[in-house]
Amino acid sequence: MLPAFDKKTGDLNVIIETPKGSRNKFAYDETTGLFWLSKLLPAGMAFPYSFGFIPSTRAGDGDPVDVMMIYDEPLFPGILVPSRLIGGLKARQSEGGKMKQNDRLFTVPILPQEYSPPRHLRDLDKHLLHEIKDFFITYQRLMGKKFEIHGEFGPKEAKLLVQKSLKK
């Protein structure tokens, strides 16, 4: 199985599930190794950035740890993107009538010709971050769930969260 962190470079491995701009929500099936169409977002909604997961991790909801990749172009489902964590949102989501921790992590791709990408969540434009927060809240509400954001954190805390979620 692909590790969460590249053994040579230490870069975070991210597998893309859903491309930026898509209304389709794709999910990876570990049993078959295939991606399947799991949801259609309501009219007028689309993923603001590509969404994926970190392999060899397990979040509190039983799935691999989710990440949103801050990158201008849509990325194809199934591709591996060497990435750097820039932070996350402390969040809780309703699941089976109970509120459970379900933080959101953010990454940027590591590219040789990078144009000075953000290194910390606070480097993002405040309006952009507000729009991303609104996306998560609205998306969950339209799926019949409640989503609450309780703060933000930087790359160090994000890396600790990933390390705690590594499958043993």
Residue ranges and their predicted role:
Residues M1-K168:
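Hydrophobic N-terminal alpha-helices or hydrophobic patches in metabolic proteins across all domains
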